[in-house]
Every structure is written in C-alpha cells, then in structure tokens.
C-alpha cells in the first residue's frame, strides 16, 4: 500500500513539473518519465488510483489522457469487459464530481467519446453495448444546470469524435461507424438539442448566471456539431468546403419542413447577447445549406421565404453585426443564399426587392469600411459574383434588379480600394496589396460582377484612371512633388491596373459584344501608355507593386486576346491600332516581349517580378501560333543569342542570394527551348551556338573539380544554375531530333561532373535536388523522344548512369544518421522521392531491354533495385503516406516493379516483402485516389503472379518453379493474414465506401478471392449474418450473383465478367442496405 502512495506522489509531482514548471529541462525529463509510465504494464490500475486519490487536477488530467491512449491503441487492445468498466466508471465519476476542473471534465468526456466510438460495433449478449449514449446522459439532463452541461457536452463531444477520422484506424472503419451513428442516433440527438434550446429560449434566461450561460453555449455547440456532421463521407478537406451542401438525410425532413426549427435560431439571434450569436449564425449557415433535393419545389420556396425573412430582419436591425465574429458568420449566411438557391427562386420571394436593396446597402457599407474584417468580404463578393453570373440564365418574369445594384457594388469596391491607399501610407498600416493571393481572389470575383452593366464599370475606370494618371504625370514633372504624393498616385494606379486586368479577364466569349471589346480597348490603351511612362523611369526608380499589377494585367490580356482561339477581327485591336499603332497580334506580342526583356534587365534581382515575368514568357511560348510569331521578333532572336548574365542579371552567380533563388532559371530555359525548337530542325550548328554559355559553365565546373582546392560556393552556384537551365531545356525538347542533340552533348562529356557533384554534396539538398531532378528529366521518355537507333547502346548506357547516380546518392544519404523530424523531408525524403521517380521513368521508358543486364553480368539494374530497397526500408510506413510527393513516386515505382520485375520482388527477404505488402495495404485506404489506384494495380500484379505460380506448382511440369517463386509462395503461405486483410479492405471499400475507383478495385479482388476461397466464404457469411434477419436472404443472393459465371482463372474474359458482376453487386448491396442501421460485426471487416 505504501508503494502505491509513494508512486502516486511521484506521479503527481511529475504532473506538476510537466504543466507548471518554466524550466525546459525539468519539463522534458517529466515528459519522458510520464511517457514511460503510459507504456508500463500497470498503467491502467495506477490511472484509476490517480482518479480516486489524486490531490491535483493535473494528475486527474494525466489519468484521463493515459486511459484515452490505452483504449485507442490498435495493437493489444483492451478486452471488452474492461472497456465497459472504464466507460461506466467515467460516467459515475462525472456524476459524482460536478466541480472538477474544466480541462479534467473535458478529458474524461473525450475518453468516454473515444471508447464509445471504437466500441460501436462491439456486442455482448446480442446487445450493442456502446450505443446507449442518450440513455447514458439522461440522468445528467434531468439534474441541475451543472449536470445538464456535462450531459450536453458528452453528446457534443461524441458527435464530434465520431465525425473525425483518425490516422490510427482505417478510413473504412471510420465511415462505417459514422454511417451507423448517423442512422441510429444523430437525429435523436439533434431533436433533443433543439428541444432543449426551445426550453431555454422559452424561459427568461438569466445570462448573468454563469452556469446558464455555459449551458446555452454547449447546446449551440451540440446543435452545430449535428448540422456539421459529414453525413455521406465527402468532407475530407475542411478548408475547401465553405460553399458545400449539407447532405441532410431524408429521415430529417420533418425537422426542416417545420418552420419553427428555422425560426428558433432567428429568435435566439435576436434574444441572446452578441457573444453567443456567432454560433447561432453558424447553425443558420448549415441550415441554409441543406441539400435542394430534401424539398419539392413548393416546400423549397416556402423554406427559402422563411430564410430570406430572417435575413431581412437581421439587416433591418444590424446592431449586433458590429461584432467581427457575427459579421463574418452573417456574410457566410448571405453567400449561402445564392450557392444553394437559384436566382429564379430568389426573385419570387415576396420581399425580394426590399431584401436585395438591403443586401446591396450592407455590401456597399462593408466595402467602404475596408479595414473591418477583410476576410469576410470574400463571402459578400461571392454572393454578388454568383448573382451576376446567373443573370443571362434567369427565366423568371419578376425583376432581379441587379442592373441597379451590381454597379453600386462594383463602384464601392473600386473607390474604397483607391481611398484606402492614402490612409495606409499615412498611418503605416498593412497594405492589402502585400497579400497577392487575397487580392487575386477578390479580383476573380470582381471580374464577374464588373462585367454586369459593363458600360458603367468602364466609364468609372476610365474616369478614375485618367484622373490618377494625369496627377501622376504632373507630380513626376514637378520638382517640388513630395514622395508621399507620388506614392499615393502609384498605389491608386496599382489598384486600377489590377482591376482593369480582372475585368478584361472576366470577358465571356458568348456574352460579349463588339461595344464591350471596344471598351476593353480603351482600358488596355491606358495601361500600355502608363507602362511606357513607368518603363522610361526605371533607370531612376520603379515601383514593385505597380510592376506586379502590370504583369497580372498582361496575364489576363494574354488569356483573352492572344492565342489560337481569339477572333482577330476584335474591336479591341482596332482601338489599339488607332491610339498606339498596334495593328495586329504580332505587334502586341512585340510589346509583351519588350516588357519581359525590360523587366529582366531592371528587375533581375527582384524574385517576385522575375518569376512572374518568366511565367508570362513561358505561357506565351506554349501557344502554337503565338510561339511562331514570337520567333520572328528581333527581341526574341536577341534572347536566343544572348542568354548570359551580361544581359540578364538573374543568370549571374550572386553570392548574396540563396541557391533556391535560381528556380526561375528553369522556367526561362523552358521557354527559350520551345522558341529554339520552332526553327531548329536538325541544325546542329545552331544548337551548339545556343548551348555555348552552358558549355562554358560546364567547362568552368570541370576545371574547378580538377583541382584539389576550389571555391566551393562558386562551384555550387555555377553547377546549380547550370543544371536548372538544362532541366528547362530538357523539358522543352520533347521531339526525338532535338533531344538527341542534347543527349549527345551531355553524354559522355559532362555526366561525370553531375556524378561528382552528388558524391561531394550529397548532404546538401540545395545542390542534390536540382541535379537529381535534371537526371529524372533526362531519363523520362516524354513523347517517345528517347528512341535510339537499333545499333546504339545509348539506352543501356543512360540507364547505367541512372543506376550509378541512384546508388551513389542512396548509399551516401543513408549515412546521415538520425535526422530531426521537422527536417527529414528536406534533407532526406525529397531526394529519395526524386530517385524513386527517376528509377520509375527509366524502368518504364521502353528504351532498355533489362534482360540483358543479368545475361552479360552487368550489375547496373541490380544495384539500382537493391538501393531502392535500402532507401525504402529507411522510411517509416507513416512517412510514405504523410508526404504526398513521396507517396506518389513510391507507389508509381512499385506499380512498375510489380508489373515488369516480379521475380525481383519475389526474391526479397521475407521482412522486406511484408513491408511492401503492408505499404500496399495501407495505401488502399489512402485519401489520394492516385495512390489508392496504384496500390490496386500493384496488388493485382502480385496476386496474378501468385495465382500463376500456384497453378504451375500443382501441375505436373518438367520444369520446376524457380527458386524465387518457390520462396515467395512459401512466404505467402506462412503469412496468409496479409492477403486476407487486403481482401477484407477491398471488399469493405466496395460495399461500404463512396468508392471512386471501382474498376481499379475490382481487378485484384477476383485474384484475392480465388487465393482465399475459404476466407472469402467466412467473410461473406459474416456480412450476411450481420444484416437484419429480413435482409439476410437478399444479401446472400447478392454474393451468389457476384460469382455467377465466374471460372477459377484470371483470364481477361473472366476478369471482365467479374468486373461487370461487381458493378451490379455494389448497386444491389447499396439498395439492400439503404434502410439498414445494422453494422458488420466482424473484426476482420472492421480492421
């Protein structure tokens, strides 16, 4: 007993050190000791002692979090009886201790929610023992306010817990639990929550009473969690679902047809303090977003009418909207009015004219107060963008009145941005123009709004632009002009150039008229005249933000008015001809190139301008007709003949800048490569002339490497710049003739230099990444450009170099030792990922016969594959799926290996094979469809190989199985659980998930079934028996039909028949299970 007391005291002391000490070393030691405690065998009993006898809240918190970890573990899970005991203990503990610290109560409720979720399908005497949440909390709800808060919080946390997938359990299991919870409990919880809210709002709540205050807050959180539930498993990315539909089940219809539900929340909004209102509005946002198909047309019109009335009432009494959180949620609510309902439906609402006037006034006022809640403006602009986009399609006879109000919104946005410039400069405030992402998002929305009543938009822009441009010109000519006044006009012109680019980019070909094109011409003329003025001053001064706005304008102009699809008779070109003498597209392209060269000359050290300028050049070089016109321009010929640091400073070796600043060079040379290819043909002299600067750079690096002591920084910069340039050229050269010139130039002369760089600087990703990426590009047989002559050994020689580089990098990178978690991708995994991509490109390029390597005793292939295995085994399973680029490169390489090199896979050690199979098993449930599809393909190849070898081994053949195949079969027979697990997973996904790649899933399934017929039979029986008695026969028939006409082979005809059967099977199973709330009581199916 004394030992228990002593160890409790130690644990309490450690908790105090962990949560209270300011000394980092002490805290880390305490953390380490507590981790050991969590993993100790007597953790469970000590946690109970801590809860019973612990004197501090921190020790209670530790006990609750440790117990949560224990019940969550997937290996060695706690027995069912023990988990039931913990659940009951937690409920009793909460019921007898209402005055616990809030964080302790929260941790215990989290423990209850986790046990309930993970035990959702656990049965004891035919009773689902963890499905009694509402019964469990009834005793809390019938007690005092303090207990009622605990009960509501339990339901809220449970709903939230079941809605969230976690990485330690398969997604299929999560969705099955969520679906069952949705069907059996969620509506009851939502109804209970609404009833409690009605009771609370019916009483005169004393919100000075902190407990009643807390109860209302928890009820609103619970209601929001119910409405925010992922009903059909589609909201995997919460950052992008802001305009999504809430997929309310049909069984909830009654709650939404009853107008009192909607009215409850509008009444609450007006009757409770502003601090609660954001949650009320969040609930209204979700209610406004219920799927359209929940109602028929008449019901939807009635629901929309109530919704619009509620919005109108808020707009007529806007006092609470001065709170930023309320304002933000209300803007979201307004955006849902158009994302979920059609303009034709809105205009039929009785109060529409008054409501659209109020919304327009609210929007104009909001835009004028640009400094208040800027992130909320997105939702208002989204509403008006959707309204404006609907105008051409609206069929209703009722007036939409948008021709009156959209110009007001456009004017408010434009004038408010211009007026903000002076205040921002005067008060030193944060400039919205610094956040180019936010500005671009708003401009995309304005582009649609501004095209509605475009004449008014253009007239306003011309008037404001002329005023600012004239003032700017006068200030530049005045000797006494203050820098502040010049900065203000430059800021105003920056906004105007951005906005002009946006409205031109908003042009829609089928809805545009000659008059609107002529108006575009007026705007373009003004921007180009301003560009001439600012370019003429670049030698003295320049404005970075204005230059970025110009580039944004050029990009929009290019998309709309330059290219193969543009009608050359456009009135825009007529206006450009009259004002600026630009008669056709070629002359306009000349202006583009002139601007690009000017920017590269004067802004070569400004990364944002350089990268956007080069992106513009790159985009121009893609178009079939524009690239041919560009090549004829003298400025483009100048670039092709003078691409050196003397003319383009960003190509220089600036010792002050970072090595990663050279990324833009790849873009530059991709564009130059495309331009060069237009007229290159087979002209080797022209090619060699073009490559002279790169040849000189290679020779310089070779010279440095040949001496024992050289300037390492200079060598690195020269090499990194060079390989980035070459990757751009290699990417552009996608024809055989041009690519062969590049290959013969680089091999064998310069390949040793790349190998030497990897050998020297393997630990520095700033050097290795560009070199590895270049090699990956060189071995990529894009557009069949790597077609060597039949007498050429170059394909094999290229693969030897690939193997050499992978082996050298791989062996050296593994010597790095332990890498900190936050640096592991940059220092190690990124390079490994590129090596995987490189090997995949080489193996699938169809320019090497890999059979000859072993035949002639060449170990290049074997070295590359063995290095791949070494690198793979150095990566934890979790990292393979945590880093998307690594996932995609690994699984696509594995797909090639299982397809063409299965003998190599079969020859691996058992632990390696199990590692690879585990990675495939985990990848089957990945959220990335590409990864999941790749895993299906890998599994199909492995299963097919196994089936063929098994078939051969049972036949009397004169030639025995080779040693690798025999060993592989033996390993698979020793570990059948891995293949069986994958059979469970695939079948589970097909039956219970929103399976987006059903065809891919079907291909390995037949082989899995044929290899595991007894297991499949047991699995089938388990699924059938888990259904309600009246549905079991139908489910049994579904499985019978699945195997109807299927033979015991994997021939294409048989596979195709199975795939067809599977489509019908999935449909029939879904129909059969639609009204079923029963789950699958099978550990195999759920794991």
Curated annotation (Swiss-Prot):
Q: Where in the cell is it found?
A: Cytoplasm; Nucleus
| Organ and tissue specificity | Strong expression in testis, thyroid and bone marrow, low expression in lung, liver and small intestine, no expression in thymus, and remaining tissues studied have moderate expression. Expressed in red blood cells; overexpressed in red blood cells (cytoplasm) of patients with hereditary non-spherocytic hemolytic anemia of unknown etiology.
Q: Which residues carry this modification: Phosphoserine?
A: 570
Q: Which residues carry this modification: N-acetylalanine?
A: 2
The record ties this protein, via InterPro entries, to: ARM-like, ARM-type_fold, Importin-beta_N, XPO4/7-like
The Importin N-terminal domain sits at 30-96
Which UniProt keywords are present, listed alphabetically?
Acetylation, Cytoplasm, Nucleus, Phosphoprotein, Protein transport, Transport
Keyword Cytoplasm part of the UniProt annotation:
yes
Alphabetically, the GO molecular function entries are: nuclear export signal receptor activity; small GTPase binding
Gene Ontology process terms (BP): protein export from nucleus
- Tell me which SMART domains the record gives: IBN_N
The keyword Oxidoreductase appears for this protein:
no
Q: Might you report a single GO cellular component term?
A: cytoplasm
Task: Tell me the Pfam families matching this sequence.
Answer: IBN_N
**Stated role:** Mediates the nuclear export of proteins (cargos) with broad substrate specificity. In the nucleus binds cooperatively to its cargo and to the GTPase Ran in its active GTP-bound form. Docking of this trimeric complex to the nuclear pore complex (NPC) is mediated through binding to nucleoporins. Upon transit of a nuclear export complex into the cytoplasm, disassembling of the complex and hydrolysis of Ran-GTP to Ran-GDP (induced by RANBP1 and RANGAP1, respectively) cause release of the cargo from the export receptor.
Q: Assembly and partners?
A: Binds to nucleoporins. Found in a complex with XPO7, EIF4A1, ARHGAP1, VPS26A, VPS29, VPS35 and SFN. Interacts with ARHGAP1 and SFN. Interacts with Ran and cargo proteins in a GTP-dependent manner.
Which family, according to the similarity comment?
Belongs to the exportin family.
Could you tell me what this protein is called?
Exportin-7
**Lineage of producing organism:** Eukaryota, Metazoa, Chordata, Craniata, Vertebrata
Gene that encodes it: XPO7
């Amino acid at each position: 007993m004394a030992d228990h007391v002593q160890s409790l005291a130690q644990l309490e002391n450690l908790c105090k050190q962990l949560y209270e000490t300011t000394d980092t070393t002490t805290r880390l030691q305490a953390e380490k000791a507590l981790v050991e405690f969590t993993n100790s065998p007597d953790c469970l009993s000590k946690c109970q002692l801590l809860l019973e006898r612990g004197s501090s809240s921190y020790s209670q918190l530790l006990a609750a979090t440790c117990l949560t970890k224990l019940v969550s573990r997937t290996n060695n899970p706690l027995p069912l009886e023990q988990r039931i005991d913990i659940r009951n203990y937690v409920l009793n503990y909460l019921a007898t201790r209402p005055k616990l610290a809030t964080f302790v109560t929260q941790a215990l409720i989290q423990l209850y929610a986790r046990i309930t979720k993970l035990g959702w399908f656990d049965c004891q005497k035919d009773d689902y023992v963890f499905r009694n949440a509402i019964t469990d909390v009834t005793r809390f709800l019938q007690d005092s306010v303090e207990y009622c808060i605990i009960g509501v919080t339990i339901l809220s946390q449970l709903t939230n817990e079941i809605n969230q997938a976690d990485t330690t359990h398969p997604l299929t299991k999560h969705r099955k639990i969520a679906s069952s919870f949705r069907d059996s409990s969620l509506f009851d919880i939502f109804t209970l929550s609404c009833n409690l809210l009605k009771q609370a709002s019916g009483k005169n709540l004393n919100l000075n009473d902190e407990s009643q205050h807390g109860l209302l807050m928890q009820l609103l959180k619970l209601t929001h969690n119910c409405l925010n539930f992922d009903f059909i498993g589609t909201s995997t990315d919460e950052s992008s679902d802001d305009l999504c539909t809430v997929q309310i089940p049909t069984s909830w219809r009654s709650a939404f047809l009853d107008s009192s539900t909607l009215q409850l929340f509008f009444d609450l909004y007006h009757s409770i303090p502003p601090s609660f209102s954001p949650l009320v509005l969040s609930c209204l946002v979700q209610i406004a977003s219920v799927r359209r198909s929940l109602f028929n047309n008449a019901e939807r019109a009635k629901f929309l009418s109530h919704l619009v009335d509620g919005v109108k009432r808020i707009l007529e009494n806007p006092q609470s909207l001065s709170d930023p959180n309320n304002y933000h949620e209300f803007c979201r609510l307004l955006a849902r009015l158009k994302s979920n309902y059609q303009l034709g439906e809105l205009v039929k609402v009785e109060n529409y004219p008054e409501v659209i006037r109020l919304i327009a006034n609210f929007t104009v006022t909001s835009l004028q107060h640009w400094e208040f809640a800027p992130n909320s403006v997105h939702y208002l602009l989204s509403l008006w963008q959707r309204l404006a986009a609907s105008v051409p399609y609206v069929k209703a006879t009722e007036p939409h009145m948008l021709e009156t109000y959209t110009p007001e919104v456009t004017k408010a946005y434009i004038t408010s941005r211009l007026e903000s410039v002076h205040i921002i400069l005067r008060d030193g405030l944060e400039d919205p123009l610094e956040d180019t992402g936010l500005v671009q998002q708003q401009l995309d929305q304005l582009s649609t709004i501004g095209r509605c009543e475009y004449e008014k938009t253009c007239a306003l822009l011309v008037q404001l632009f002329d005023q600012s441009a004239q003032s700017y010109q006068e200030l530049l000519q005045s000797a006494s002009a203050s820098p502040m006044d010049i900065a203000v006009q430059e800021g105003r012109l920056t906004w105007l150039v951005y906005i002009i680019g946006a409205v031109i980019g908003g042009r829609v070909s089928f809805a545009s008229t000659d008059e609107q094109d002529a108006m575009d011409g007026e705007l373009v003329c003004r921007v180009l005249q301003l560009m001439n003025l600012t370019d003429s001053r670049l030698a003295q001064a320049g404005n970075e933000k204005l230059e970025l706005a110009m580039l944004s304008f050029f990009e929009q102009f290019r998309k709309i008015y330059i290219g193969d699809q543009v009608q050359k008779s456009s009135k825009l070109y007529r206006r450009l001809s009259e004002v600026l003498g630009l008669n056709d597209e070629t002359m306009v392209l000349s202006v583009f190139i002139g601007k690009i060269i000017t920017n590269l000359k004067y802004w070569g050290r400004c990364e944002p301008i350089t990268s956007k300028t080069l992106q513009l050049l790159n985009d121009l070089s893609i178009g079939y007709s524009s690239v041919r016109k560009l090549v004829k321009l003298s400025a483009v010929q100048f670039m092709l003949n003078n691409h050196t640091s003397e003319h383009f400073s960003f190509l220089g070796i600036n010792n002050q800048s970072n090595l990663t600043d050279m990324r833009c060079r790849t873009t530059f040379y991709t564009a130059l490569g495309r331009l060069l290819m237009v007229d290159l043909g087979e002209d080797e002299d022209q090619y060699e002339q073009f490559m002279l600067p790169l040849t000189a750079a290679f020779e310089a690096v070779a010279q440095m490497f040949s001496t024992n002591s050289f300037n390492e920084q200079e060598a690195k910069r020269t090499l990194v710049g060079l390989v980035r340039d070459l990757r751009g050229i290699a990417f552009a050269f996608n024809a055989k003739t041009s690519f062969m010139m590049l290959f013969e130039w680089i091999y064998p002369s310069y390949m040793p230099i790349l190998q030497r760089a990897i050998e020297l600087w393997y630990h520095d990703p700033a050097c290795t990444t560009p070199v590895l990426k270049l090699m990956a590009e060189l071995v990529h047989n894009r557009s069949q450009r790597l077609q060597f002559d039949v007498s050429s050994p170059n394909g094999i020689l290229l693969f030897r170099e690939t193997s050499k580089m992978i082996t050298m990098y791989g062996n050296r990178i593994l010597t790095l030792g332990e890498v900190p978690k936050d640096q592991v991708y940059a220092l190690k995994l990124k390079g490994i990922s590129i090596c995987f991509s490189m090997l995949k490109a080489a193996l699938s390029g169809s320019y090497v016969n890999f059979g000859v390597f072993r035949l002639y005793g060449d170990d290049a292939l074997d070295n590359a594959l063995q290095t791949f295995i070494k690198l793979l085994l150095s990566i934890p399973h979790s990292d393979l799926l945590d880093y998307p680029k690594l996932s995609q490169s690994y699984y696509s390489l594995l797909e090639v290996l299982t397809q063409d090199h299965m003998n190599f896979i079969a020859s691996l050690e058992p632990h390696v094979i199990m590692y690879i199979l585990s990675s495939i098993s985990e990848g089957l449930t990945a959220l990335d469809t590409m990864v999941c599809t790749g895993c299906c393909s890998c599994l199909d190849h492995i299963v097919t190989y196994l089936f063929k070898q098994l078939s051969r081994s049972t036949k009397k053949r004169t030639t025995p199985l080779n040693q690798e195949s025999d060993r592989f079969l033996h390993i698979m027979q020793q570990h059948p659980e891995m293949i069986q697990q994958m059979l469970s997973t695939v079948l589970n996904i097909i039956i219970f998930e929103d399976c987006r790649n059903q065809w891919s899933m079907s291909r390995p399934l037949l082989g899995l079934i044929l290899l595991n017929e007894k297991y499949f039979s047991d699995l089938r029986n388990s699924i059938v028996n888990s259904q309600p008695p009246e549905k079991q026969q139908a489910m049994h028939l579904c499985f019978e039909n699945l195997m109807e006409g299927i033979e015991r082979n994997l021939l294409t005809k048989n596979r195709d028949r199975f795939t067809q059967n599977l489509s019908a099977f999935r449909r029939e199973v879904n129909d059969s299970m639609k009204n079923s709330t029963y789950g699958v009581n099978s550990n195999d199916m759920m794991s």
